[in-house]
Amino acid sequence: LWDEDLRSEILLVDSAREVIGVGLNSLGYSLNDTDTDHLQEAYAKLCELTPNVKAIVGDEIKMLLANEEAAVGVVWSGDAAIIMDENDKLDYSIPSEGSMVWFDNIVIPATARNIEGAHLFINFMLDPENSAQNTEYVGYATPNAAALEYLPEEITGDERFYPGPDVTDNLEVLANLGKRMLGYYNELFLEFKMHRKRA
């Protein structure tokens, strides 16, 4: 990302944990680091990236990348699958330094009024055939092992989305760092965005 050939060619997703995480991972630190010295190092490293950042954007990142309005984007894997469906010249890779692993959760709130309906919906979504269909639609890999047999090999064999342990061993789940530390991440991200405007 810091390659001078990428000047004004990178799109970043508008999310503090993801962007600060890029800085942390590039330095060999955990995405869940709470050491303020490490976080300041990550901020400084991101400031060095400023000349290469074209924009920090939200959901429009998919359209911008598909239209080749930037050479590189830091995106979630499901968005990458959608982007690559729209433009087969684009590719997706997971940084060797590491990245995050995430998953959606289906929960039933304590205040839910239709518990039976909620269970029916969850069971419907977890049905292997339905789960496979959902995976093909959203582009995100499925953790539902029973659904894998309903997916084509071109999906399950794609190591960009179903990587082996050599890649997954460098992935981390984002931990809840608490309000104070989350506030610190958000402050650093805001400082980074302001630094870009001044640069």
Model-flagged regions — what are they?
Residues M100, P109-D169:
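Mature extracytoplasmic/periplasmic domains
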Residues I61-L64, A80, A118, S131:
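Short, hydrophobic alpha-helical packing/hinge segments within bilobed ligand-binding/sensory domains
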Residues L39-E48, E86-A112, T156:
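Periplasmic-binding protein-like
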Residues M63, P165-A199:
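Conserved C-terminal helix/tail region of periplasmic/extracytoplasmic solute-binding proteins
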Residues L1-E69:
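Extracytoplasmic ligand-binding site segments that recognize negatively charged/polar headgroups
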